[in-house]
């Protein structure tokens, strides 16, 4: 019979493999250039999360190169420095207890919204299938926040935005960090990447919609609710789950 330690090690190895594959998805889905993105996943039972190492090309990654940290930000396993965005991921895991994975990219259209400081309202059912309402813009950081602990304060600003506006993280698994780029999250590392894909597509669709009809006021609430709830609500019936 296998010990709990051995089972725990197997689960951690599985998480490292999932996070590695999720980072490769960023390239496959066209969400990143160079090394402009990272994915992490958390093991809540062990209080650890796994993240991409900093500045390593995606084609050079392997499960063994993933960095394991505890939720205090201390490296538990790994020889490389973790992503420079690690403190942001850590804060999101600490404060959003329902999430299991975080993705950060500089995907082109979503980053346009971040740089412009413009929210993305729900313009159609594609958006409603993934995001329950308007994707928010997180305020810019102050000079002191940037100088003191930039990445940690980025995470704190995201949490502040969601709490001040009463936004539930699993209903709105995305945001635009002003002047920076988008962050998404989900039930797992893989799920968080899928939400990044959806955000990028919805951002591109949103821009195109405004070009065609600058007066577009957004999807009526009764249609938004129907599409969101049929996929994510208590009586969800979309898919085979």
Model-identified regions with their sequence ranges:
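Glycine-rich flexible loops
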Residues: 2-241
């Amino acid at each position: 019979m296998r010990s709990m330690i051995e089972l725990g090690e197997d689960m951690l190895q599985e998480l490292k493999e999932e996070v590695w594959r999720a980072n490769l998805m960023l390239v496959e889905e066209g969400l990143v250039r160079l090394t402009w993105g990272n994915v992490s996943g958390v093991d809540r039972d062990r209080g650890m999360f796994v993240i991409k190492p900093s500045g390593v090309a995606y084609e050079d990654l392997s499960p063994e190169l993933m960095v394991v940290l505890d939720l205090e930000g201390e490296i538990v396993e790994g020889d490389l420095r973790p992503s420079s965005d690690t403190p942001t991921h850590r804060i999101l895991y600490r404060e959003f207890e329902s999430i299991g994975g975080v993705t950060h990219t500089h995907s082109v259209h979503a980053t346009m919204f971040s740089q412009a400081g413009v929210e993305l309202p729900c313009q159609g059912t594609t958006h409603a299938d993934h995001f329950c309402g308007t994707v928010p813009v997180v305020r810019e950081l102050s000079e002191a926040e940037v100088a003191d602990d930039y990445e940690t304060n980025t995470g704190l600003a995201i949490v502040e935005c969601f709490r001040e506006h009463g936004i539930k993280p699993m209903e709105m698994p995305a945001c635009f960090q002003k002047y920076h780029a988008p962050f998404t999250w989900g039930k797992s590392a893989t799920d968080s990447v899928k939400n990044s894909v959806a955000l990028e597509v919805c951002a591109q669709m949103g821009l195109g919609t405004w070009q065609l009809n600058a007066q577009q006021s957004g999807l009526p609430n009764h249609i938004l609710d129907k599409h969101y709830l049929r996929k994510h609500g208590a009586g969800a019936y979309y898919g085979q789950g």
